[in-house]
């Protein structure tokens, strides 16, 4: 049975989408479709903005940054770790700022997310015990949780038991709960969280830097700058782990030039702190003793290594010589004072990221020199043999007697 149109507008609508369209009608369809898509896009933005409303500025910035840069595998910002065991919840951990944002569709799910981050409980369906130990999520000797001492409960106590973790989770849900779509809470680590995080890796740093004869303060400073001590760090370019190693460049170079055979390390290998630090330290040695050989002053060599670790040796040469001539670039470096070369790197290097990187690492080297040589007076809370520090004088980065082919 034919149903008559109820109005002129309905008649025109039926005609528009059932008859063979004219060019004008096709244009109308395109415009209508685009208008609908724009409306949906604005509604999505409004919904996301509404979710961020009410958060402190630094928390909203973290959530927005993750939203803008994440992919199917999680965060591509090295200092941010996103843990999402299922579709109902998510935990974001910012190793740089010390902020933790846990969210879930349900209150019970949120409590589970909070307890997980406080204790890094091992669920075999998510991560097995062996992997957790390898990644440093639980200290193999003390069995302490990964964030032990970095997070304190409402009584100012460190958390290592299920009872205390659940008690603190209940406190947070009762006092800090936020509901905008999902249920969520924001948790802050202690002010010294990065110092405490870095202390976990000092033993590995001392072992690798002794082997490769480089300054441990340099490795600590690079580690903080690259990942803020996030062992699961991953960048958009797939640089991995604490020192942000790219498997097919720095990783392969390490095995070829130091181990003596061609090999590209796996992601699982690079996510293990001891191995990541060993490769990073070895690659710093390769930069100094092969790619940057010829720079005479140890301090200028150290600054050149820092710049090249971030931007590559080729960009260093191009910054100093328009044709990228290595020999001429090195000759120019050797004519500069240490102060002039540092100024050049932080003001004239062709990559702005590298200019900022050199500033950050150089500042942090000074911090770690003080922390490593003054343990016990506000320094890194680990036991360090003074003989190991003496073997790495802070003013002499590399021993010049050894070269890498």
Report each predicted region and the residues it spans:
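Cell-wall glycan-active module
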Residues: 2-224, 232, 289-298, 322-405
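Active-site metal-coordination segments of metallo-dependent hydrolases
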Residues: 193-196, 267-277
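Short, well-structured alpha-helical interface segments that form or flank functional binding sites
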Residues: 200-203, 213, 217, 237-240, ...
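Structural recognition of the beta-strand scaffold that forms the well-ordered cores
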Residues: 221, 242-244, 307-308
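Active-site-proximal beta-strand/loop segments in catalytic clefts of secreted hydrolases
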Residues: 225, 246-248, 309
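Secretory-pathway/luminal and periplasmic proteins that interact with or process carbohydrate-rich
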Residues: 227-236, 252, 311-323
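Substrate-binding/active-site groove segments that recognize
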Residues: 236-263, 275-286, 335-336, 361
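Catalytic and binding regions of secreted/periplasmic enzymes and modules that target cell-wall glycans
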Residues: 276-325
């Amino acid at each position: 049975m034919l149903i008559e149109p109820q109005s002129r507008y309905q008649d025109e609508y039926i005609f528009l989408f059932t008859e063979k369209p004219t060019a004008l009608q096709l244009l109308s369809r395109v415009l209508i479709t685009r208008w609908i898509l724009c409306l949906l896009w604005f509604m999505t933005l409004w919904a996301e903005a509404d979710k961020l409303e009410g958060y402190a500025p630094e928390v909203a910035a973290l959530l927005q940054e993750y939203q803008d840069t994440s992919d199917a595998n999680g965060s591509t910002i090295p200092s941010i770790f996103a843990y999402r065991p299922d579709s109902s919840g998510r935990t974001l951990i910012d190793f740089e700022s010390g902020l933790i944002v846990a969210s879930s569709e349900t209150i019970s799910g949120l409590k589970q997310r909070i307890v997980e981050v406080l204790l890094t409980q091992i669920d075999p369906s998510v991560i097995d015990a062996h992997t957790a130990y390898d990644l440093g999520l639980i200290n193999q000797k003390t069995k302490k949780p990964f964030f032990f001492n970095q997070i304190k409960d409402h009584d100012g106590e460190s958390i290592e038991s299920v009872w205390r973790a659940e008690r603190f989770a209940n406190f947070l849900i009762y006092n800090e709960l936020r509901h905008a779509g999902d249920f969520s809470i924001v948790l802050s680590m202690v002010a010294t969280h990065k110092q405490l995080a870095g202390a976990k890796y000092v033993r590995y740093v001392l072992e690798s830097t002794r082997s490769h004869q480089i300054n441990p303060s340099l490795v600590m400073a690079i580690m903080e700058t690259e990942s803020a001590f996030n062992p699961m760090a991953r960048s958009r370019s797939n640089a991995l782990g604490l020192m942000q190693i790219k498997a097919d460049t720095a990783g392969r170079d390490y095995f070829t030039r130091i181990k003596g055979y061609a090999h590209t390390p796996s992601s699982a290998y690079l996510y293990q702190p001891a191995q990541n630090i060993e490769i990073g330290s070895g690659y710093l040695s390769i930069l100094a003793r092969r790619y940057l050989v010829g720079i005479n002053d140890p301090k200028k060599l150290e600054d050149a290594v820092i710049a090249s670790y971030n931007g590559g040796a080729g960009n260093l040469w191009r910054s100093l010589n328009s044709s990228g001539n290595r020999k001429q670039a090195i000759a120019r470096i050797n004519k500069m004072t240490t102060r002039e070369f540092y100024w050049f790197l932080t003001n004239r290097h062709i990559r702005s990221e590298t200019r900022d990187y050199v500033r950050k690492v150089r500042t942090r080297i000074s911090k770690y020199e003080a922390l490593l040589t003054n343990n016990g007076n506000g320094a890194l809370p680990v036991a360090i043999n003074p003989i190991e520090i003496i073997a790495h004088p802070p003013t002499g980065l590399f021993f010049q007697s050894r070269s890498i082919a």
